[in-house]
């Protein structure tokens, strides 16, 4: 198992951060460069949940997103993936702060094959920077 924790401050309000995290339209690929539009499939979308397949040629996963606006949380649990196994997930915590939001992210990855285990082994080394940079970039979009 690989775990990465990051904290990012954003000028966006908590509601704006939540919108970026839960926007499954074609804008998702603009906010998250690791998501290819041709691999983005929204299977089900509700008021506070979504089941989505997203990713790129290297890695993809089908996830169940659930969010709670009042609590400021978003969770994405992996249902299927070409590299990640059961228990893999993203947890976001959005806290209002003066001038925007503080966003905490916890990523847990369980490699289900050799490719997943190799990528997972690199996460503690390079994952924090990659996730932090990606999140900072995405949260500048409104």
Where are these regions (language model features)?
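Beta-strand/loop substructures that line and gate deep hydrophobic ligand-binding cavities in soluble
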Residues: 77-132
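A short, structured loop/turn motif at beta-sheet edges
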Residues: 11-15, 45, 67-72, 93-102
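Glycine-rich portal/gate segments that line the openings of hydrophobic small-molecule binding cavities
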Residues: 36-82, 137-141
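Short, surface-exposed coil-to-beta transition loops
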Residues: 2-5, 59-64, 85-91
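Hydrophobic ligand-binding cavity/cleft-lining segments
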Residues: 1-47
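Short amphipathic alpha-helical signal-transduction/dimerization elements
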Residues: 25, 29, 123, 127-142
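Hydrophobic pocket/interface hotspot
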Residues: 17-21, 65, 76, 103-105
């Amino acid at each position: 198992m690989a775990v990465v924790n990051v904290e990012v401050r954003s000028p966006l309000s908590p509601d704006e951060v939540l919108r970026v995290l839960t926007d499954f339209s074609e804008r998702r690929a603009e906010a998250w460069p690791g998501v290819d539009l041709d691999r983005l499939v929204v299977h089900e979308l509700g008021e506070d949940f979504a089941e989505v397949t997203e990713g790129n040629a290297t890695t993809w996963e089908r996830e169940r997103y659930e969010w709670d606006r009042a609590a400021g949380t978003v969770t994405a649990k992996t249902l299927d993936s070409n590299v990640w196994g059961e228990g893999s997930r993203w947890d976001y915590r959005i806290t209002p702060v003066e001038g925007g939001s503080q966003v905490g992210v916890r990523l847990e990855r369980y490699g289900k094959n050799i490719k997943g285990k190799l990528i997972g082994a690199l996460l503690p080394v390079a994952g924090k920077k990659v996730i932090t940079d990606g999140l900072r970039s995405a949260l500048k979009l409104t």
